[in-house]
Each structure stands twice: as C-alpha cells, then as structure tokens.
C-alpha cells in the first residue's frame, strides 16, 4: 500500500479541492463575504429571534455559492459549478433582506436617541430677552415664583417691613415699563410667563461683581444692542427684585430656572415665540432658521473650577486635560444685612454634583462664614457696635443677635420697623440653611473630550462694541435641578 501510486482520479479530486478553496478565499477577500459577514453582523443580531439567525445563515451559504459561481462558471463540470447550479446566488433580494434587518435593529436605537432630545416652546415678552439679538445657543431662564415670593415675604416675620414695600414697588415699576398691568394678578401672571436671558441677568447684577470692568462691558454691550431707551431702568428694577430675594433668604435660584439653549424664534414687536433645547446636543439639533452648532455665553461669566489659580486646591483627578467635563450655572450670594449681593457664572468642572458641592465648600469657606454671621448690623459697623458696650467684648453682639432671633423682638426702638435679619436660628440653636446659604448650582450639560479641543473663543461685534464669547460645540445639554450649598 505504501508503494502504490495515486491514480489520475485522486489527483484530479485533490486539484479540484485546492482550486475550490483558493477561489473561495479570493472571492471572499474581494467581495467582503464569507467569514467576515458573521463577525460584522453578530453584534447587531445578538439577542435577535431565531428566524433572523436562519436568514444570516442562508445569506452566508448563498454568498459562498455566489463565489463558486463567479469562479467556475455555469458551463464547468467541477464540483463548485455543480453546487452553484443547485443553489441560488447572492442577489438583490438578499441585499434587500440585509438592509431591512439592519434598519429594523437600528430603528429602536435611533428612536431612543430622538427621544432624548427635549424641546420647549415659550411665548414671552421681549423686554428682558432679545432672541434676535442673543443669537442661537444662548441660555434662557424662566422667571417664575414671583407671586410665591410676595406671599412668603408677607407672612415672614424675620424681614424688614420696608423690604416688602421695596419689592412691590420694583415689581410694579418693572411691569409698567414692560407694558404689563402694574397691579392685580394679571400683571404677575404675564410677568411669570416671560423669559430672562443670561446676558440681561448678568447685566442687572453688574454692580455686585468683583471683576466689575469686564461685566460693565457686558452691561454696555447689552444696552447698546437692546435698542430700548428704558432698558437701563428695567435692569435696575430687576436687580432690586433679586436683591430683595437675597436679603429675605429666598435667593434668586428659587425664582429663576434654566429653560435651555435658544434654537429658533419668531419675533414680533414686543412678543416672541421662542423654541429652546432642554435636553440633547445643540450641535445635532436640526430644522433651525439659522445655524446653531454650539452653546455660547459671555467669557466674562466663565469660571474654571479646575484651575488651581482660580480655585486653589483641586482634588486629584479633577485637573485632567482629557476626559469629560460638566458645565454648571452657578449663583454666589453674600447676605450681609445692608449689602446683599449675588453673582452668576457659568462654571466648568470635571467633578460631578456631589464632588462639586464639597469643592465649593472648600473654595468659598469665607463667604459661607460671613453669610452665617452678618458682618454689618443695622445700627452700624460690627466692631464699632461692640466697642461701645460696657464690657468691651464685640462677641457679645452675636449673643444679642441670638436672643433677638430666638425671641423675635425688635432690634432697637430707634429703628422703626426694623427686624433682625443678621441671624436665622433654628430650633436646635444653630444657624439654619437659609442663613448659611452661600451658593447654588444647577447642571447644564456634559461634554466629552479635553477642554482645549471642546472650547473655542469668538468675538461678537455690535454697534462698534465687541464682546468675547465662549462656545462649546460638543456640549450635550441636560438641565438639572438647583442644589443649594450651605
């Protein structure tokens, strides 16, 4: 047996098998079929019904038959030719089946992506927001809760009596300037149906910022672009309303809520219908009247919480140059008795909400202490008031403040109608959260990639003035809720 020579039939069969294998490998390489098809389609049909698996098996078998048909031809007498004659080749029907199966598997994912985008439409007066001037991608805020604020202050016993009158006066003047009914519930309802842009809000708070030069430039830019002779008076009265909310320990974040990024608007003389994106990517949102590919805000309002030069010690891993980062809307408060103030920023951090709150506690510890115990009593300077006492200990003023806050008595007969607003003491004998609140933040969105590539700076020129903007093209908006820091 070992010395037997193979006959011609065996040699022909071996040659035929070698030709078939080489032809199959060559056509698989050219057409991308064969063993590549199951590897590409396996993740798509993972968990699919058995019928789909049978379809894939039939497609693979027909693809192999098609390669044999291309290699040998229908007129050959080889085994590949006979097999191809018995089976159907990979044709248009099979391609249509693959396309339908792929679309059927991708459709739920596409629907889920579309469902993640949330758009809101609001009809608003254009006194405190100019959609045609702000431009797409600008942040808008709902101005809500004015009626609740008035009712709460009327029932509050720890505020100045004049504070309610100042708030009502500023609110009536603002309504009158905006052309709304100055009295009654109609004025409140119309005012609460309005939007406030981030630029207008920051322009109203310009006197309270420490970097007053940059924010004053923003205020001048807003006044020049608003084309409204009464806009300066509107900003002043809006500032008085927000100052009253800080002094009464209700804070602006209780009446201002982020509405989203402006996408498109239909403008009239004093009214506009505004569409805003609350959830989703601004870059992927389509159907816009003007190109809107990024979330934008003034550069003077930007606060980098990952920068050690601005915020001191940064936790390990928070100052990475790569990875994702979060974008927040941040309020900072100073609740001194006669000097209440507030600031608003757009902050960037690599930390989530829980980590950001701990970081803000470290960064603004001095502001937190000053808000707990006011530095300026109603009668004058804190230290001067203490030196006038017989015992000469200025710390006794804190004990007096504790007694006044606990007993709810008047501060001084010479101060008509004055109420102690320097300390709010809880039933446990410690300052409550309202008296110690120094900040509030709300998540706006998240972006992937390093900040250097995800951010770009542009300059907007209007009426001979220029304002620097920060643009975030890849930001995915996800408006959260306010979280107070105290």
Swiss-Prot record:
Transmembrane segments: none annotated. It comes from the Viruses. One of its GO terms (molecular function) is DNA binding. Pfam families: Herpes_VP19C (PF03327). It is found in: Virion; Host nucleus. Keywords: Capsid protein, Host nucleus, Virion. Belongs to the herpesviridae TRX1 protein family. Structural component of the T=16 icosahedral capsid. The capsid is composed of pentamers and hexamers of major capsid protein/MCP, which are linked together by heterotrimers called triplexes. These triplexes are formed by a single molecule of triplex protein 1/TRX1 and two copies of triplex protein 2/TRX2. Additionally, TRX1 is required for efficient transport of TRX2 to the nucleus, which is the site of capsid assembly. This is Triplex capsid protein 1. It comes from Psittacid herpesvirus 1 (isolate Amazon parrot/-/97-0001/1997). The gene is TRX1.
């Amino acid at each position: 047996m070992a010395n037997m020579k193979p006959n011609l039939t065996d040699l022909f069969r071996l040659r035929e098998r070698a030709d078939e294998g080489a032809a199959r490998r060559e056509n698989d390489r050219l057409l991308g079929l064969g063993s590549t098809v199951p590897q590409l389609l396996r993740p798509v049909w993972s968990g699919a019904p058995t019928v789909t698996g049978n379809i894939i098996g039939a497609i693979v078998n027909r693809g192999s038959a098609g390669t044999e048909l291309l290699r040998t031809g229908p007129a050959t007498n080889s085994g590949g030719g006979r097999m191809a004659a018995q089976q159907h080749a990979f044709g248009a029907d099979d391609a249509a089946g693959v396309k339908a199966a792929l679309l059927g598997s991708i459709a739920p994912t596409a629907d889920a992506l579309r469902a993640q985008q949330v758009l809101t439409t609001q009809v608003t007066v254009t006194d405190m927001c100019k959609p045609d001037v702000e431009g797409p991608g600008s942040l808008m805020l709902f101005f809500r809760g004015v009626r609740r604020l008035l009712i709460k202050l009327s029932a509050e016993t720890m505020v100045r009596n004049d504070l309610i009158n100042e708030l009502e006066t500023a609110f009536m003047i603002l309504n009158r300037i905006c052309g709304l009914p100055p009295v009654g519930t109609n004025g409140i309802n119309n005012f609460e149906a309005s939007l406030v842009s981030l630029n207008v809000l920051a322009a109203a708070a310009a006197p309270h910022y420490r970097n007053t030069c940059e924010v004053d430039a923003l205020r001048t830019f807003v006044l020049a672009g608003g084309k409204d002779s009464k806009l300066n008076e509107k900003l002043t009265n809006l500032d008085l309303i927000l100052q009253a909310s800080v002094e009464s320990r209700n804070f602006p974040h209780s009446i201002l809520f982020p509405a989203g990024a402006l996408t498109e608007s239909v403008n009239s003389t004093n009214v506009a219908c505004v569409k805003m994106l609350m959830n989703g990517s601004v870059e992927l949102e389509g159907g816009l009247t003007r190109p809107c590919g990024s979330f934008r805000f003034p550069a003077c309002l930007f606060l980098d919480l990952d920068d050690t030069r601005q915020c001191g010690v940064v936790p390990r891993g928070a100052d990475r140059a790569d990875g994702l980062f979060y974008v927040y809307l941040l309020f900072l408060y100073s609740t001194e008795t006669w000097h209440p103030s507030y600031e608003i920023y757009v902050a960037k951090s690599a930390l989530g909400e829980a980590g950001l709150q701990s970081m803000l506690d470290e960064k603004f510890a001095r502001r937190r202490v000053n808000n707990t115990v006011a530095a300026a009593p109603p009668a004058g300077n804190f230290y001067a008031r203490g030196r006038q006492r017989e015992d000469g200990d200025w710390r006794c003023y804190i004990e007096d403040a504790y007694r006044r806050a606990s007993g709810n008595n008047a501060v001084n007969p010479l101060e008509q109608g004055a109420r102690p607003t320097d300390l709010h003491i809880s039933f446990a004998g410690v300052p409550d959260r309202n008296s110690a609140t120094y900040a509030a933040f709300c998540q706006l969105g998240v972006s992937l990639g390093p900040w250097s590539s995800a951010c770009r700076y542009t300059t907007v020129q209007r009426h001979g003035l220029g304002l620097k903007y920060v643009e975030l093209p890849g930001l995915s908006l996800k408006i959260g809720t306010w979280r107070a820091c105290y």
